[in-house]
Amino acid sequence: MATEVAAAVPPPQLDAEENSGLEAAAAEAKIQPSSGPHKLERKWTFWFDNQSKPKQGAAWGSSLRKAYTFETVQEFWCLYDQVFKPSKFPPNADFHLFRAGVEPKWEDPECANGGKWTVTSRSKASLDTMWLETLMALIGEQFDEADEICGVVASVRQRQDKLALWTRNAANEAAQMGIGRKWKEIIDVTDKITYSFHDDSKRERSAKPRYNV
């Protein structure tokens, strides 16, 4: 359970000064091996993408950067407390947590046939809360269809922030509906959320949703 993972080790209070650069900030976390680390079922990787100042002619995703891969609860809390809160980032920044070995791109073999559930956030505080609840659910293997999930993306925007939960097999409606219902429960959302296929999004920017819960 995600709650068990969260409770396993209290969030560490770090004295290291935050650095404005993402990689430097991750290093500032000063993660140290500890006695009796609480290992996760699988490794996870944080990614960062700032699209606020794209270079002319740059391909989509060219600013995507791998930030840190972790495999223990202790590492997770160090990283989250020190760096990885969406509200800390400027507009047009995308923040990702994906299974290690999977890149947050449509072209990745694990994502190519997938899609995403999307939810919008009414405030920065709400975004941070939903983000943290989702992270704990993922690393805590709280979803019955955990192997179907690639990761989650927090998109910080000027007008409206959003979270997107990426999955592997969009055509597997039963699995996607189960994931969608569970996610709504985890982030405590009552409004309808929608699921779109990556293939549809490639062809059409405002692709019509295929599923909703």
Swiss-Prot record:
Observed effect of gene inactivation: (Microbial infection) Increased resistance to plum pox virus (PPV) strain D.
Region (Disordered): 1-37
Binding site residues for mRNA: 56-61, 88, 106-107, 157-162, 202-205
Cellular compartments annotated: Cytoplasm; Nucleus
Signal peptide: none
UniProt keyword Nucleus, yes or no: yes
GO biological process, one term: defense response to virus
GO CC, any one term: nucleus
Tissue: Mostly expressed in leaves, flower buds, leaf buds and anthers, to a lower extent in roots, stems and green immature fruit, and, at low levels, in petals.
Source taxon at top rank: Eukaryota
SUPFAM superfamilies reported in the protein's UniProt record: eIF4e-like
Gene3D superfamilies recorded: RNA Cap, Translation Initiation Factor Eif4e
PTM entry text: According to the redox status, the Cys-111-Cys-150 disulfide bridge may have a role in regulating protein function by affecting its ability to bind capped mRNA.
Disulfide bonds: 111-150
An example Gene Ontology molecular-function term: RNA 7-methylguanosine cap binding
Keywords (A to Z) from UniProt: Cytoplasm, Disulfide bond, Host-virus interaction, Initiation factor, Nucleus, Plant defense, Protein biosynthesis, RNA-binding, Translation regulation
Family note: Belongs to the eukaryotic initiation factor 4E family.
Subunit (UniProt): EIF4F is a multi-subunit complex, the composition of which varies with external and internal environmental conditions. It is composed of at least EIF4A, EIF4E and EIF4G. EIF4E is also known to interact with other partners. In higher plants two isoforms of EIF4F have been identified, named isoform EIF4F and isoform EIF(iso)4F. Isoform EIF4F has subunits p220 and p26, whereas isoform EIF(iso)4F has subunits p82 and p28. (Microbial infection) Interacts with potyvirus viral genome-linked protein (VPg) of plum pox virus (PPV) strain D both in nucleus and cytoplasm; this interaction is possible in susceptible hosts but is impaired in resistant plants.
Physiological role: Component of the protein complex eIF4F, which is involved in the recognition of the mRNA cap, ATP-dependent unwinding of 5'-terminal secondary structure and recruitment of mRNA to the ribosome. Recognizes and binds the 7-methylguanosine-containing mRNA cap during an early step in the initiation of protein synthesis and facilitates ribosome binding by inducing the unwinding of the mRNAs secondary structures. Key component of recessive resistance to potyviruses such as the plum pox virus (PPV) strain D. (Microbial infection) Susceptibility host factor required for viral infection by recruiting viral RNAs to the host ribosomal complex via an interaction with viral genome-linked protein (VPg).
PANTHER family: EUKARYOTIC TRANSLATION INITIATION FACTOR 4E RELATED (PTHR11960), EUKARYOTIC TRANSLATION INITIATION FACTOR ISOFORM 4E-2 (PTHR11960:SF60)
Protein name stated in the entry: Eukaryotic translation initiation factor isoform 4E
Gene: eIF(iso)4E
